Amino acid sequence: MPELPEVETSRRGIEPWVAGQTILRAEVRNARLRWPVDEEIIALRDQRVLSVQRRAKYLLLELEKGWIIIHLGMSGRLRVLPQPQPPEKHDHVDLVIGNGCIIRYTDPRRFGAWLWSDDLRTSRALAHLGPEPLSDKFDGRWLYQKSHNKRTSIKPWLMDNTLVVGVGNIYASESLFVAGILPGRAAGSLSEEEAGLLAESIKAVLLRSIEQGGTTLRDFLQSDGKPGYFVQELQVYGRGGEPCRVCGTPIQMAKHGQRSTFFCPACQH
């Protein structure tokens, strides 16, 4: 599933093509996504895009009247087509832009979503979200305060969007490795120093992945069709049985919250 770096990469990829431009129309070939594409999007005509934003794993297109909220789901991606091209099987939604380009949404598994909101303050999709991990609000003090008396394992705890948004399976594993913290420990066992180190590690890993265009494991591609190159820098995720790049110990895999977790038993404590 695309996580924060992949969604931010998508945002940066489409922003130069659509910000300040007019969406002439939306062409919806298959409205049956995770939730049906909202009727306001299907009927969209001649609306100028004021800004392209991101909140958590959602892309937000601010229009003159209303917002388009896009979630990429498990396998969704956005492409910029400078010129029209015939759609393929999994190309479900096009935004036809006044400058001649098309923003095309492709989603083989159809777990993504295209939602409409008149006012983001009333959007159910964005309710109850925690702070952005790259914001000043998210730091070691925040993590330490929230960890008190928590018995759940640190890894699934980090993936709770009410704690911090956008940290999914890949980046939780990678951040815990950088911080030297075992993912199976109880969240309540974090010391204040460890919480600070973990917050810094999350920020560093996410920023580096954004610089590299995200991580391509299967479906994700950048808006220009290139893969995300952070996959070449993964320290533990998807490397079960392979030697740790730091100490040579075989990387182990475990299940936490029914999700695969990867870690080095020597480097993490």
Curated annotation (Swiss-Prot):
GO molecular function, one term: 8-oxo-7,8-dihydroguanine DNA N-glycosylase activity
Cofactor or coenzyme needed: Zn(2+)
Binding positions (DNA): 90, 109, 150
Catalytic residues of the enzyme: 2-3, 57, 259
EC annotation from Swiss-Prot or TrEMBL: 3.2.2.23, 4.2.99.18
SUPFAM superfamilies in the record: Glucocorticoid receptor-like (DNA-binding domain) (SSF57716), N-terminal domain of MutM-like DNA repair proteins (SSF81624), S13-like H2TH domain (SSF46946)
Recorded catalytic activity of this chain's protein: Hydrolysis of DNA containing ring-opened 7-methylguanine residues, releasing 2,6-diamino-4-hydroxy-5-(N-methyl)formamidopyrimidine; 2'-deoxyribonucleotide-(2'-deoxyribose 5'-phosphate)-2'-deoxyribonucleotide-DNA = a 3'-end 2'-deoxyribonucleotide-(2,3-dehydro-2,3-deoxyribose 5'-phosphate)-DNA + a 5'-end 5'-phospho-2'-deoxyribonucleoside-DNA + H(+)
Keywords of the record: DNA damage, DNA repair, DNA-binding, Glycosidase, Hydrolase, Lyase, Metal-binding, Multifunctional enzyme, Zinc, Zinc-finger
GO biological process, one term: base-excision repair
InterPro entries: DNA_glyclase/AP_lyase_DNA-bd, DNA_glyclase_Znf_dom_DNA_BS, Formamido-pyr_DNA_Glyclase, FPG_cat, MutM-like_N-ter, Ribosomal_uS13-like_H2TH, Znf_DNA_glyclase/AP_lyase, Znf_FPG/IleRS
Zinc finger (FPG-type): 235-269
Cofactor: how and how many bound: Binds 1 zinc ion per subunit.
Top-level division of the source organism's lineage: Bacteria
HAMAP family tied to this protein: Fapy_DNA_glycosyl (MF_00103)
Protein family: Belongs to the FPG family.
Record note on quaternary structure: Monomer.
Job description of the protein: Involved in base excision repair of DNA damaged by oxidation or by mutagenic agents. Acts as a DNA glycosylase that recognizes and removes damaged bases. Has a preference for oxidized purines, such as 7,8-dihydro-8-oxoguanine (8-oxoG). Has AP (apurinic/apyrimidinic) lyase activity and introduces nicks in the DNA strand. Cleaves the DNA backbone by beta-delta elimination to generate a single-strand break at the site of the removed base with both 3'- and 5'-phosphates.
Protein name in the entry: Formamidopyrimidine-DNA glycosylase
Organism: Sodalis glossinidius (strain morsitans)
Lineage, highest ranks first: Bacteria, Pseudomonadati, Pseudomonadota, Gammaproteobacteria, Enterobacterales
Gene: mutM
